[in-house]
Amino acid sequence: MNDNHSWFFTEALMNEEVSQPVVAAEASAPLGLREQSKREVTRRIRAAAVDLLARKPFSEITTREVAQHAGIGEATLFRYVGSKDELLTLAYGDRMDALLDELQSADDLATEAVGAEGAGEWYCARVRSFYEGRAAFYLQDPANAALYLRQGFDMTSAGRARTIAQGDRLIERVRSILAEGQAAGALLSRVDALSVAQNCHGIFIHEVDRTPTRGFEPSTIWQRVHARLNAQLDPLVIEPPL
C-alpha cells in the first residue's frame, strides 16, 4: 500500500464509528435490500463527488469531504472506492457514457433524416459533431475533465480501462462513419478509415493536453480542434461531378 493510500485509510479508520449504522444495516438485510442499500450508497458517493468537483479542482477535494457530503463515514467510503482517484472515475464515467449515448443517438437521427448516402462533407460533419460534443463537455469543467481523460494514460489508475473503452467506442463510431462514406464513393477509399479515426481522436486529446501547457484559453478548445479536424477530413472528400 502506498503512502497516499495509507493516509486515506488512517483517516477512514478514525471515522469508523460514523459508518457503523450503514455497515450493520447491510449485514443484517436480506440480499435484495442489501443490494439496494449498496446502490444507494454508491449513488450518494457519486452525487457528492460530482457536486464537489463542480465547485473546485480535484486536487483540493479530500475524501473526508466526499464522505461527509454523502452522509457516510470514510470507512464506508473506502468500502466502495479504493482510492481518491476512483472518485474521479465514479463522477465522470457515467456522465461520459451518457454523453456518448446522446451523441450517437443524435447521429442516428441525422442519418435517418437524410435517408440515403450524403455528400462527402456530410460524413465529415457527422464526425465533427462528436468532437464538438466532447469539447462542450470539457468546457463544463476543463481541469477535472482533463484529469479524467488522462486516466487512460496512467498505468496505475483504476479508471484506466473505462476511459480507454470510452475512447475506443468513439474511435469505432468515427471509423464506421468514414467507412460508410468510402463505401458510398463520397470519401477517398485509399485512406484507412481506422487510422483517420484514431488521428481525429488524437487531435482532441492533444488539444486538451496543450491547453494549460501553452496557456490557451479553454474556451478556444473547439476552435482549435475544429481547424485540425478540417485539415484531417477535408482532403478525403470526393467532390461530385458537375
Model-predicted regions and their roles:
Residues 1-29, 136, 140, 172, ...:
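C-terminal peripheral helix-coil segments that are non-catalytic and often amphipathic
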Residues 1-56, 60-69, 86:
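Basic, helix-initiating cap at the start of DNA-binding domains
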Residues 38, 42, 46, 88, ...:
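Amphipathic, non-transmembrane alpha-helical scaffold segments
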Residues 39-47, 54, 59-60, 71, ...:
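An amphipathic alpha-helix adjacent to DNA-recognition modules
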Residues 75:
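Key DNA-contact positions within bacterial/archaeal DNA-binding proteins
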Residues 90, 104-143, 193, 197-200, ...:
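Hydrophobic alpha-helical connector segments
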Residues 100-103, 147, 157-184, 194-198, ...:
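Amphipathic alpha-helical packing segments from all-alpha helical-bundle domains
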Residues 137-158, 209-213:
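Amphipathic alpha-helical segments used for helix-helix packing
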